Structure formats: structure tokens, C-alpha cells
């Protein structure tokens, strides 16, 4: 009994001692009194717990290419970690700061973020893509050119319109006194005088006049420069040209003799001789000087016969040609006028072109392109020359020898044309015969009745035999004549 009492006393003493020891350990003021061995044991326990529960690293990427590291088992040891962190914070606050322990820590760069994120590259923007006026120089040039073209179109069109109206106002009284109808546009069934020009396009104006003796009508065409076209304006700076007035008078057949005659600048006559069908056939000689008739050196003459030249170059005509030689491009009278030569891809045409008795005048407007409305008054005497030429062509008559020579020239031209087109006409006739035979054979083959088909074949055979017999008879007659 005494022994049992002694054992209980010992247990109580031991329990009180151990409880006092743990109470002292929880007090924050007495942490420093314990040895480092106690903390070493605690660190060993923590290392063992870390090695026993390895953690897996999970890396997730969001839209901004940032990486996040998640540790598995974090929730399980969250409470223990907070307690350890509090304990370590208390330790670091009480322990002195050691400079050697953290030496080089601040100088070590943080490479974890650079490994996880892509490097940022800055690209230099080209100069032509930057927002500056220099980036739009091509667009500026295009807009400027377009505006210049539009402005030139408006100005050029208006100037041509003013020139045409100025010409008409100057010549209207003279035209109305010589023609019953002035300005028919051809839109009405009955000829009506509109009293105004007909605009074909921005640089060509037409005027039709009729109702005068000895002529069917007169077509006046004002051919201005293409002032509405900027490219044409730039081209004229290198090579100036003039506005032109072309007048075409269609004569009645009974009021004009058979002859071809032309007078004008030497350059214009050479060009017309190459282009016009009648001048190339009836006036094959080179242009001759008009000094014999008192014409200036700038003008030359093309004539079918010398009699025509003597008859046309009277005093008044020479006066017009001499005083207005700078404005006259060409004067062309012809009973065989058919226009420019017909150029066909396959040889000559099979028939002669239709001809008209025509008087053709071409005048240059003064100014060499720098024309003003007041310059149109200088062309009024040339219109008087046109009216005089109409009356002169009606009065002029060839003598007997001249008519015979003119008829021979026209027969010669027709014969030469038939010789040139003989082979082509034979080929055309052969092709027509073959086409006719082919159509007849197709008609026989398409016949459903055998008896009718046989009769058609026999009729075709008889026709071929008759043609062959006629051909043989002609050959025999030719041989007899040759003998």
C-alpha cells in the first residue's frame, strides 16, 4: 500500500513538470531560450512530410499566354502551411538579419517569366504605310489629273460651241439669201428649216442647205480641233494644226460637165491624189504650178485637161485664190467623185463605185489653233467664193474635142477596171454556179418520191449535155475563124 502511494506521487510530479515545459514553449517571449536542436528536429519532420507526398505541377494557359502553376495536395496541407508560416515569421522577426546569407539574391534575374512568355518584337512600320501626305502622292496625282481632264473637257467643249455659233451668225444672212432651206436636221419627213447647226459631237458641227438652182444641196461641216481632249491639246503643243471648214456641194447631172479639176496647196494635192479615187485615175500627173495664171507659189493645180484649167481660172476665181491663199487648203471639182479609195481585204471591188458630180472645198480657220470667235468673219469671203463656183460650174461647157477626150478617159478607166477584176469576176461566177448545182442536188436527194427523183436527175443530166454541146460549138467556131 505504501509502495502504491509512492508510485502515484511520482506520476503526478512527472506530469506537472512536462505540462510546465509545454506551456513555456507556446509562449512567444521564451522561443529564443530553446536550442537549435529543437528546430532541427522540426525541420526534419517537415522534410519527411514533403518527400512522402510528392506534388504534381499543372501548367495552364489562358488567352493572354500567361502560365499558372497549380500544386496538387495544396488544399490538404493548407492548414498546416499556415501554422508553419506563422511560426517561421515569428522566428525571422526575432533572429538577427544576416547580410551574407542573402548575398547576390537581389542581383539574380528572374528568368521564370521570360521562359514562359514569348519575346516581344517591335516591327518598324514602312514609311509608305504611315499616315502622312507623302503616302498618298499617287492618289493625289491621279485626282489632280482627273480634275484637269474634266476642266479641260468643259472649257474645250464650250469654246468649240462658241466658235461654231460665231461662224453661223456671220454666214447666216448669206446662206439664207442663196438657199431656201438652212439647217435641216433630217428628223422630220418634210424638209424644214431649223436655222441652227446640228452638233455631231463635241468638235464637229453640220449644216445642210438646199433649195437652190443647179445643185441638190450643200453640206457644211465645221471640223474643230479636239479641244475637249487633254491628250490632243498636249499633242498640238508639239505640232500646231488649224480648225477646218469643209463644204460639199452636190450638183445636178445636167448642170455640170464631165471633168476633174483641183487646186490647193501642193502637200494637200499630193495627199488627195493618193486617197481619192477620181484624182488618182483621171489626174495621174504631178501637181503643176499655177504661176501661169498668177497664183502664188504655195498653190498648185491638178487637172484632167488643159481646157478645164483655162476655163476655170478666170479673173474672179484667181482673185479669190490669190487673196485668201493662206486660208485655202483645197478646191476639188469632179463629175466622178466617189470619195476615198475602197480598200478591201480580198482584191479589187467587183464593180465601179457610184459617182456624183461634186464640188468640194476645204478652208483653214485663221489662228493655227488659237482661234477666237472674231476670226470667223475672215471666212465670209470664202463662202462667196463657194457661191460663185456653183454658178461657174453650171456655166462652164467643154468643146467637142474636150468632150471626146473626157469620154475616152472614162472608157479607159472602166476598161482597166474590168481587166483588173476579170479573174475575180470569173471566180465569183464559178462559185455561184457551184452553189446552184449544190442546191439542185440537195433538192433531188430530199425528194421522197423515187419516180419524181429519177425525172429530176434526167432533166439535170440533159441540161449539162446541152451546155457541153454549146461549149464545143463555140470552140469549133473559134478554130474556123483562126484558120
Swiss-Prot record:
Q: Where is the composition biased (Basic residues)?
A: 473-483
Instruction: Give residue spans on the Cytoplasmic membrane side.
Output: 21-135
As for membrane topology, the entry says: Single-pass type I membrane protein
The reply on keyword Transmembrane is yes
- What does the protein in this record do? Component of the multi-pass translocon (MPT) complex that mediates insertion of multi-pass membrane proteins into the lipid bilayer of membranes. The MPT complex takes over after the SEC61 complex: following membrane insertion of the first few transmembrane segments of proteins by the SEC61 complex, the MPT complex occludes the lateral gate of the SEC61 complex to promote insertion of subsequent transmembrane regions.
User: Which controlled-vocabulary keywords does the entry list?
Assistant: Coiled coil, Endoplasmic reticulum, Glycoprotein, Membrane, Signal, Transmembrane, Transmembrane helix
Coiled-coil-forming residues are 451-481
* Topological domains annotated Lumenal: 156-483
What name does this protein carry?
Answer: PAT complex subunit CCDC47
